[in-house]
Amino acid sequence: VGWDFTFMDGIRDRNTGIWKNISIYATGKVALRHPFIKSELRKPDYGQARETVSVEVINSSTSNSGINCKVKGEIVGENISFEKSFRVIRGEQKLVTFSPEEFPQLVMNSPRLWWPVNKGPQNLYDLKLTVSVDGVICDSVKTRFGIREITSDTKTPDKSRVFYVNGKRLFIRGTNWIPEAMLRHSDERTYAELRYTRQSGVNLLRMWGGGIAESDYFFQLCDELGLLVWQEFWMTGDTRHPHDKALYMSNVESTVKRIRNHPSLAYYVASNESTEMTGTPELLNQLDGTRGYQMQSECAGVHDGSPYKQVNPMQHYENTASPRGSRVDGFNPEYGAPTLPTVEILREMMDEKDLWPINKEVWDYLDGNGFHLMTTMYTDLVNHYGKSSSIDEFAQKGQLLGAINSKSIWEVWNYNKLDYGDRFCSGLLFWYHNCSMRQVASRMWDWSLEPTASLYHTANSLEPLHAQFDYLKNTVSVVNDFYRSFDNYKVTAQVYDINSRKVFEESAVVNLPADGVANDALTIRFPDGIS
């Protein structure tokens, strides 16, 4: 299985060809590769960081017995510099390390920490390294990094996995990311999709195991936007392990070396619903050692996903949306629903004659062979708003359905955040939020980057201070995503009838705990006979 598994046709030759930029450049007698800076933060105040810097020095010459060289480094703008002289023999690839024990200047007091969205600033530093021979610089590298610690454990009431950033618990409100179908990743598209992602309010992106490791620019933007990344390694439960283990492990190594300096990179997972390749955890510990790891997406405190399709929104509140049983609990890696694209996008996808009346064969083809039941279940739910007489009317009502489902999903998880709700919930990864190609089962936006109502209602539900209504209990709760408390705040609920006459109003004073929820702050009493 690949990233195209829910599409109408598989992507031909998807495992061949060049899909990233290739650069050719010249260096002097020696070259630098794969710089890495590792932070160790002092507990419990996180007021000191011990930095360990390493870089590979390569002498690719075959015509000399050895070269005396010097590597110099600096953390730009921090008055921190260091250097080391050594010899590299011909053909040697030497790992040169600068430790805080050897270089006390690499102990940073009061470091500016990096935080995910809503939790603090996205502070970043620059590391610059040069290598010289006889005073002449042969090569230089520069990398950006952030100082932070991300850990996780299963010390929770239900043994579900909970994440921590710089020692503080982090409620995960994340999504699954699927790569563009033909891997046509321009910087402009990447920026647009991550800008939408940040606008939505989510704090983590799962690089689903059937996909890829995204571009350097993708990770750069995640660093700047405060978006965490859960990186999986290209295996799923629907397929066998790679035939060429050495090639697979080489891919893991090159990928980790490429992305490990990014503070947004939070977690490694070997596969989607499968098992790991033997030796993977040992390799990750050798190459990185600063991030958590699990062998597949549904283990170690992360249960299996669902639902994947539209349901009556009340089922999210009742916790009956999944045929597999309770899924609003613990850490769910895949829970979501599609949203119909706008009518303009639908007209770009198919002929008018297939739009209305709905041509089931064509629509199912554009729904991954009917995977999301857009012509049956989704259509039935849209019809709850009344029968439609045109595709324009149907598409508009389809936005209403997508909006209420997205809002219901996020707000149910808000209510049950960590210790505050009826059940302990540590994280949700919405399945999925971006579209890899044109499909009638759209998400927060379509492949052509046209937003749906799902984006705006997700953004509303995930605003850092958010008042929300529980359709099952008729209560109003207030959710706080900041690491600070808010006392003596007033929440007001008003009810209007169909003629815009206010028929109910009530207020309550709430004290919002840091990163907490004031659940059921007030109850709405609907007047009898309201319409």
What are these regions (language model features)?
Residues 11-12, 155-304:
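Active-site mouth of glycoside hydrolases
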